[in-house]
Structure formats: structure tokens, C-alpha cells
């Protein structure tokens, strides 16, 4: 039987040496929200707690300033 090994999760922000997550960096923030607009949890992405809090704050600020949508497009 073949075993499938999951790739080890790692924090991208720690690896890149990011100090602060910016709410104006929409390209990065879009990687951490689902198609329906929900914030992806850290157990899925592997983000450390410190950066998950910064990510949450940045996404909420970007939503408030209409840089990111709160939900997906309704049809």
C-alpha cells in the first residue's frame, strides 16, 4: 500500500521575514480568503498565531475601505 504524506505546513510570513502585514497588499490578502469571502483558518494555511491576528486585522480593514468584498458576488 502506498502512503500519502501531507506536505508540512509552514508560515509564509515567518519564512519571508515579514514584520507587518499591510492591509493595502490585496494580492497577499486574497490568498487567505475563500471564494465566499471568509477568512481561511490558520490550521488550514499553517500561519502562526501572531501573523493570523495581523492577517485578520488587515482583511477587516481592507473590507471596511472597500478594497476587498465582504461576500462573493450574488447573482
Swiss-Prot record:
Gene3D superfamilies: Ribosomal protein S18 (4.10.640.10). Disulfide bonds: none annotated. GO terms for molecular function: small ribosomal subunit rRNA binding; structural constituent of ribosome. It holds the Pfam family Ribosomal_S18. It comes from the Bacteria. The keyword ATP-binding does not apply. One of its GO terms (cellular component) is cytosolic small ribosomal subunit. The keyword rRNA-binding applies. GO terms for biological process: translation. InterPro entries: Ribosomal_bS18, Ribosomal_bS18_CS, Ribosomal_bS18_sf. Keywords: Acetylation, Ribonucleoprotein, Ribosomal protein, RNA-binding, rRNA-binding. The modification N-acetylalanine is found at residue 2. Binds as a heterodimer with protein bS6 to the central domain of the 16S rRNA, where it helps stabilize the platform of the 30S subunit. Part of the 30S ribosomal subunit. Forms a tight heterodimer with protein bS6. PANTHER family: 30S RIBOSOMAL PROTEIN S18 (PTHR13479), SMALL RIBOSOMAL SUBUNIT PROTEIN BS18M (PTHR13479:SF40). Belongs to the bacterial ribosomal protein bS18 family. This is Small ribosomal subunit protein bS18. The lineage of its organism: Bacteria, Pseudomonadati, Pseudomonadota, Gammaproteobacteria, Enterobacterales. The gene is rpsR.
Amino acid at each position: 500500500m502506498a502512503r500519502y504524506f501531507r506536505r508540512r505546513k509552514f508560515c509564509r510570513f515567518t519564512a519571508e521575514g515579514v514584520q507587518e502585514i499591510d492591509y493595502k497588499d490585496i494580492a497577499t490578502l486574497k490568498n487567505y480568503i475563500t471564494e465566499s469571502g471568509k477568512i481561511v483558518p490558520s490550521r488550514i494555511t499553517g500561519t502562526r498565531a501572531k501573523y493570523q491576528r495581523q492577517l485578520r486585522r488587515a482583511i477587516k480593514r481592507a473590507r471596511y475601505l472597500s478594497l476587498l468584498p465582504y461576500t462573493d458576488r450574488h447573482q
